UniProtKB/Swiss-Prot annotation:
Record gene name: ureD2
Protein's name in the database: Urease accessory protein UreD 2
Family stated for the protein in its record: Belongs to the UreD family.
Cross-referenced PANTHER family: UREASE ACCESSORY PROTEIN D
InterPro entries registered for this protein in UniProt: UreD
Biological source species: Bradyrhizobium sp. (strain ORS 278)
Gene Ontology molecular function: nickel cation binding
């Protein structure tokens, strides 16, 4: 099977809105994935479900083929992270680990998908595809990051990283395909930086994306030792962000800055909607 063709998901989760909360209505997982309890912990967003994805192996190995699928049905709100940074170990010559992440966000849903970075060990080889399908009136923040580590301190690097991000509106052709392919990279290529990341922010058309991009740029400027750039995506569909840093902690600060801006926008929009909802509510009989 081609590396670009996803296998049957070994993690398959579906989320629905029931009353004032989001719940899981499909929970299927197999080794190495583990899913324990999920939580409603955000007092400002009581509808939002927090999920921590775990792996029994704690790492990605040379010939792993892993597919995840997350489906958010109409009105669901989900925040997803992982148990910690995931190591990607050495692959035999001619082999590479393959991972697909399929994210489907339906009308009115909200997804915050921020897994911890991958740690690429010497001679690691990873092909990953992240496919985001997002309805026009849904919101999604999706991040991806990697760093490099040689436990022997000799400066050895990974063998290959083939990463593709696909973004599409619901049921339509891709409006963004972003690919990075590094094979046997030289140390000089990274210019002293060892941690790299990207983020895609999709918002409903009611938001001023150009103004949001400027807010992000201002937030990034306040983070030391972080190289960051934010750009508008094609057709004004969203915002794309790139990060380069010397350490992972600076990447995390950048991602936190994006999430903080998104949260402020979201809570502001909800506060503005509350008076209108109250004004149009029908009186009920005592």
């Amino acid at each position: 099977m081609s590396d670009l063709s996803p296998d049957k998901p070994r993690l398959d989760l579906s989320f629905v809105r029931r009353g004032s909360r989001t719940v899981i209505d499909r929970r299927l997982f197999a080794w190495p994935f583990v899913l324990t309890r999920s939580f409603h912990t955000d007092a400002a967003r009581p509808d939002c479900l927090s999920v921590i994805l775990q792996t029994g192996s704690g790492a990605v190995h040379g010939e792993d083929r892993l597919t995840q699928r997350l489906t958010l049905h109409a009105g669901a709100a989900v925040c997803v992270t992982t148990q910690g940074a995931t190591s990607v170990h050495r692959a035999e010559p001619g082999a590479r680990a393959v991972e697909h992440v399929l994210l489907h966000v339906e009308a009115g849903a909200s997804l915050d998908y921020r897994p911890e970075p991958r740690i690429l060990f010497p001679d690691a080889a990873l092909c990953q595809v992240l496919d985001l399908e997002c309805a026009a009136d849904a919101a999604a923040l999706v991040t991806d990051a990697f760093t490099m580590h040689d436990p022997d301190g000799q400066g050895r690097l990974f063998r290959e990283l083939d990463s593709k991000l696909i973004v599409r509106r619901q049921g339509k052709e891709p409006l963004l395909i972003d690919r990075m392919h590094l094979r046997d990279p030289a140390t000089a290529l990274f210019n002293g930086r060892r941690a790299f990341g990207s983020a895609v922010l999709m918002l409903p058309p009611t938001h001023d994306r150009a103004a949001i991009r400027l807010r992000l740029a201002d937030a990034f400027a306040r983070i030391d030792d972080l190289y960051a750039a934010a750009s508008l995506l094609q057709d004004g569909a969203g915002i794309g962000v790139r990060f380069a840093a010397r350490e992972v902690r600076q990447l995390r600060a950048g991602f936190d800055a994006v999430a903080a801006v998104v949260r402020e926008i979201d809570l502001g929009a909800r506060a503005a909607q509350a008076p209108r909802a109250a004004a149009t509510a029908r009186p009920t009989a005592a």
